[in-house]
Amino acid sequence: MRLSALLALASKATLSPHYRYGMSRPGSIADKRKNPPWSRRRPVVVEPISDEDWHLFCGDMVEILEGKDAGKQGKVVQVVRQRNWVVLEGLNTHYRYIGRTKDHRGTMIPSEAPLLHHQVKLVDPVDRKPTEIQWRFTEAGERVRVSTRSGRIIPKPEFPRADGIVPETWTDGPKDTSVEDALERTYVPRLKTLEEDVMEAMGIQETRRFKKIYWY
């Protein structure tokens, strides 16, 4: 884990009470365009699912159960937990225009639309068919996903972050700051100024006398 991961926690965008989550990252330009500070959008009702019960992650192979691409399998490339959405690579697409101006109609590109969590199912690695899963614990105490049909463990995939790093396989390099060094307390606040601290550390005695200052 690098120092940038810790700094990212402090740079999270502050969201308003009327904020509505979407496909764009909170705080990005596209997100600010859809959620201006003065907007009062109607709240969206979302089925409450705890983090312990959520079982879909980026990199999972799933099969679509509903819609025009029902029966097709694809890889999860984005998860929006606040809306119970998953986005599959190249599936459930619609077309939209980008770069539209007054004189140019823009360029039409395909865009993946999100699917609700109950519209997809994980693919069993044994027979490549959709299956229900249960959370269980191994003998080592690790919490894993288990297929209810075959009993096979479905491991959580190693999926890179937005910066291309896979946290499970990352090893610190010579120029990376470790978590222990980043969290180590090395600064002790004092009432002295920087100049006074330097003089005390170097054994410098102040022999000059300040001139008197008069206020009128």
Swiss-Prot record:
Its main location: mitochondrion. One of its GO terms (cellular component) is mitochondrial large ribosomal subunit. It holds the Pfam family KOW. Keywords: Mitochondrion, Phosphoprotein, Ribonucleoprotein, Ribosomal protein, Transit peptide. Gene3D superfamilies: 2.30.30.30. GO terms for biological process: translation. The modification Phosphoserine is found at S24. It is found in: Mitochondrion. InterPro entries: KOW (IPR005824), Rib_uL2_dom2 (IPR014722), Ribosomal_uL24 (IPR003256), Ribosomal_uL24_CS (IPR005825), Ribosomal_uL24_KOW (IPR041988), Translation_prot_SH3-like_sf (IPR008991). Residues 1-9 form a transit peptide. Residues 56-89 form the KOW domain. SUPFAM superfamilies: Translation proteins SH3-like domain (SSF50104). Signal peptide: none annotated. GO terms for molecular function: RNA binding; structural constituent of ribosome. Belongs to the universal ribosomal protein uL24 family. Component of the mitochondrial ribosome large subunit (39S) which comprises a 16S rRNA and about 50 distinct proteins. This is Large ribosomal subunit protein uL24m. It comes from Rattus norvegicus (Rat). The lineage of its organism: Eukaryota, Metazoa, Chordata, Craniata, Vertebrata.
